[in-house]
Amino acid sequence: ELIRVAQIADEEQFETDRILFEEGDYGDSMYIVANGKVRVHKGERTIVELEKGACVGEMALLDQEPRSADVTVNADTTLLKITQDGFYELMGSNMEIMHGIVKLITNRLRQATN
């Protein structure tokens, strides 16, 4: 699975305090934190901090709606960027990855409603 992700992802480096995207932005990619961490927030209110192995930005790929929150890099960070085309290719080629994405989104929705 990781090899397949690596084949379609682009590695990008970000410095501390870099804004990855803002609420309302068009979303055509998602990111996996390879190392470092990012903060998902609405204004100054932190929703969650994500570290190595976490995904961010996947919601906009699935529903094709604008980004629902701001994401800022909290430390020097390496992210793996997956475009929308690569995302759907990955989902279509591996049911385990599709199941994992659905589980991730379901868990985030549960956390948001509790």
Region spans (language model):
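Cyclic-nucleotide recognition modules
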Residues: 46-106, 110
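Regulatory nucleotide-sensing modules
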Residues: 1-43, 50
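Cytoplasmic (intracellular) domains, linkers, and terminal tails of multi-pass ion channels
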Residues: 4, 15, 88-89, 114
